Amino acid sequence: MATQTVEDSSRPGPRQTRVGNLLKPLNSEYGKVAPGWGTTPFMGVAMALFAVFLSIILEIYNSSVLLDGILMN
């Protein structure tokens, strides 16, 4: 058999810590999806701006428009 399950009833549960108790409310929404589009439009705008940024960097790297008078090796 490739996988094997071990049943051990003597295994303790998760350990309680102060930090864990402080962070537990932050994890209570895990797995829930807000209805509607949510922040999708903002992500689209961010992706478009990032694409513009990459194209500007590519133009500078290729010395196509902005660096016509400067010689590069």
Curated annotation (Swiss-Prot):
It comes from the Eukaryota. Keywords: Chloroplast, Membrane, Phosphoprotein, Photosynthesis, Photosystem II, Plastid, Thylakoid, Transmembrane, Transmembrane helix. One of its GO terms (molecular function) is phosphate ion binding. GO terms for cellular component: chloroplast thylakoid membrane; photosystem II; plastid. InterPro entries: PSII_PsbH, PSII_PsbH_sf. Residues 1-21 are annotated as: Disordered. It is found in: Plastid, Chloroplast thylakoid membrane. The modification Phosphothreonine is found at T3, T5. It is a single-pass membrane protein. GO terms for biological process: photosynthesis; protein stabilization. Its main location: plastid. The chain crosses the membrane at residues 41-61. Signal peptide: none annotated. Phosphorylation is a light-dependent reaction catalyzed by a membrane-bound kinase; phosphorylation occurs on Thr residue(s) in the N-terminus of the protein. Belongs to the PsbH family. One of the components of the core complex of photosystem II (PSII), required for its stability and/or assembly. PSII is a light-driven water:plastoquinone oxidoreductase that uses light energy to abstract electrons from H(2)O, generating O(2) and a proton gradient subsequently used for ATP formation. It consists of a core antenna complex that captures photons, and an electron transfer chain that converts photonic excitation into a charge separation. PSII is composed of 1 copy each of membrane proteins PsbA, PsbB, PsbC, PsbD, PsbE, PsbF, PsbH, PsbI, PsbJ, PsbK, PsbL, PsbM, PsbT, PsbX, PsbY, PsbZ, Psb30/Ycf12, at least 3 peripheral proteins of the oxygen-evolving complex and a large number of cofactors. It forms dimeric complexes. This is Photosystem II reaction center protein H. It comes from Oryza sativa subsp. indica (Rice). The gene is psbH.
